[in-house]
Amino acid sequence: MKVVIEADGGSRGNPGPAGYGAVVWTADHSTVLAESKQAIGRATNNVAEYRGLIAGLDDAVKLGATEAAVLMDSKLVVEQMSGRWKVKHPDLLKLYVQAQALASQFRRINYEWVPRARNTYADRLANDAMDAAAQSAAADADPAKIVATESPTSPGWTGARGTPTRLLLLRHGQTELSEQRRYSGRGNPGLNEVGWRQVGAAAGYLARRGGIAAVVSSPLQRAYDTAVTAARALALDVVVDDDLVETDFGAWEGLTFAEAAERDPELHRRWLQDTSITPPGGESFDDVLRRVRRGRDRIIVGYEGATVLVVSHVTPIKMLLRLALDAGSGVLYRLHLDLASLSIAEFYADGASSVRLVNQTGYL
């Protein structure tokens, strides 16, 4: 479905009492599908303009739109979202990342500057919101929705509020150890020929998908090489997080399942049933969960509301999915994640979370 989005925002004083408005039309511009307005307290014109864009994009996504034409009278927002101008102000950068994350969900989207005379509907909504902001000392007035669709901060059927931090969870490509189905934890094998082909295909898919604000990776070579390949396709740098490393399998490193079971039959059996059990000289799955949660929390704080590519290993990715599902340890033994597969988990500032995708491999 194709839609037209009109958005506007402003402040009285710049900065001053601010608000935004957004409206989503059918492609022929004949019918209003959704509209939003909100007073946002004291802010600048540019912040309010971005907030209006985010509201319009969010409404369009929730309507199921796949294509969008965005019309705004803010030259700055149009040029920045089109990639022709750089975003330098830190307050705008955060909003830009949120807007790009929403825009990435459309198959096709374009931005057009229009004079204010062609943006009167959204301008009226924004002025209504600014009136409300001027009448209230509250910095965050409640959003006023006019039709039965949701604003960016209204609760959906999950009860979550706001824009989530979306984690695209990419498992590294194949290595010689993974090809032989051997335990591969803190050992540092590189990608093999198949692995390099896999990560190239994944990187191409992610570049076409777009909307990714950052790449965070395990420091182990197989994951880091996967991350660098994707980051180059996305024109981004790689940030390394040690808490994303694979489980330390200790003495079982490099062994097959059968070899580890033969070496320590009773311990191996218990390890498969109890996440507190530690392999000889290694770490338990409970230990992995604790550090992965710590790493996840850093990502959420550092990239709040953005889409982040997280490149890691099978166990840390399972742990992130477990956290998003708020599930028990049993889910670890029931999830299958292929090499170079993609999963998606979302985490909201209010503590809500969801899993959007598990083990996508169609691009390979």
UniProtKB/Swiss-Prot annotation:
It catalyses: Endonucleolytic cleavage to 5'-phosphomonoester; adenosylcob(III)alamin 5'-phosphate + H2O = adenosylcob(III)alamin + phosphate; alpha-ribazole 5'-phosphate + H2O = alpha-ribazole + phosphate. The active site is at 172 (tele-phosphohistidine intermediate), 246 (proton donor/acceptor). One of its GO terms (biological process) is RNA catabolic process. Residues 1-139 form the RNase H type-1 domain. Pathway: Nucleoside biosynthesis; alpha-ribazole biosynthesis; alpha-ribazole from 5,6-dimethylbenzimidazole: step 2/2. Its EC number is 3.1.26.4, 3.1.3.73. The keyword Membrane does not apply. Mg(2+) 1 binds at residues 8, 49, 73. Mg(2+) 2 binds at residues 8, 123. InterPro entries: His_Pase_superF_clade-1 (IPR013078), His_PPase_superfam (IPR029033), PGM_Phosphatase (IPR050275), RNaseH-like_sf (IPR012337), RNaseH/PGlycerate_mutase (IPR014636), RNaseH_domain (IPR002156), RNaseH_sf (IPR036397). One of its GO terms (molecular function) is DNA/RNA hybrid binding. It comes from the Bacteria. Optimum pH is 4 for phosphatase activity using p-nitrophenol phosphate as a substrate. In the N-terminal section; belongs to the RNase H family. Is composed of two domains, the N-terminal domain displays RNase activity and the C-terminal domain has both acid phosphatase and CobC activity, together with a role in enhancing the RNase H and dsRNase activities of the N-terminal domain. Endonuclease that displays both RNase H activity with a hybrid RNA/DNA substrate as well as double-stranded RNase activity. As the only authenticated RNase HI in M.tuberculosis, probably plays an important role in the physiology of this organism, being likely involved in bacterial replication. Catalyzes the hydrolysis of the phospho group from alpha-ribazole 5'-phosphate to form alpha-ribazole. May also catalyze the conversion of adenosylcobalamin 5'-phosphate to adenosylcobalamin (vitamin B12). Has a possible role in B12 recycling, but the primary role of the C-terminal domain of this phosphatase enzyme could be phosphate generation to help bacterial survival within the macrophage, which is a phosphate-deprived environment. The N-terminal domain alone is monomeric in solution but associates in the crystal to form a dimer. This is Bifunctional protein Rv2228c. It comes from Mycobacterium tuberculosis (strain ATCC 25618 / H37Rv).
